[in-house]
């Protein structure tokens, strides 16, 4: 039986030669991550990636520069019985984003009163492959 396919987006947000990433301070085992999420019904991937970037960072004004990759990820290797139809986009950061900041949002998958914090910071694009999971490397190659 083929698992369900869920449309997903990932945002590679750049400013000059740096990439915006985050860590979850209360979940250190999750590592360095990129803004990402699910495409909602009726949304295009382009609209979804902008929404996710705004929701997760707490800032608006991002611009889609390019589609980097579009691939199918089999999440069964991570113990999840689903496929992710993943669209990875290059976004340009708006002017005025700080060097570091914390933002959070509710986490509907963990209950109505749950909250998840994101500590955002910039890393040099040249170092990004050392910080991100291998599944992000193909899209990253289009930035470097």
Feature map (PLM): residue ranges:
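The catalytic Nudix box helix
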Residues: 34-68
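Nudix hydrolase/Nudix homology domain
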Residues: 29-32, 98-144
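A generic structural signal for short beta-strands and their flanking turns/coil linkers
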Residues: 30, 35, 69, 83-87
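N-terminal strand-loop-strand
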Residues: 1-34, 46
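Short hydrophobic/aromatic beta-strand or adjacent loop that forms the aromatic wall/cage
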Residues: 6-10, 84-88, 117
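Short, cationic motifs built from Arg/Lys/His that form the positively charged side of catalytic pockets
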Residues: 6, 51-55, 121
């Amino acid at each position: 039986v083929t698992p369900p396919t869920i449309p997903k987006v990932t945002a590679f947000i750049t400013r000059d030669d740096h990439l915006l990433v985050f860590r979850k301070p209360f979940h250190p085992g999750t590592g360095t991550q990129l803004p990402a999420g699910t495409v909602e019904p009726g949304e295009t991937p382009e609209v979804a990636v902008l929404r996710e970037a705004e929701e997760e960072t707490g800032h608006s004004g991002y611009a889609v520069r390019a589609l980097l990759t579009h691939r199918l990820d089999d999440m069964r290797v991570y113990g999840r019985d689903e496929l992710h139809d993943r669209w990875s986009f290059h976004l340009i950061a708006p002017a005025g984003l700080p060097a570091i900041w914390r933002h959070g949002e509710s986490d509907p998958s963990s209950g109505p009163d749950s909250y998840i914090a994101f500590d955002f910071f910039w890393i040099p694009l040249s170092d990004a492959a050392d910080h991100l999971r291998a599944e992000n490397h193909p899209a990253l190659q289009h930035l470097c």
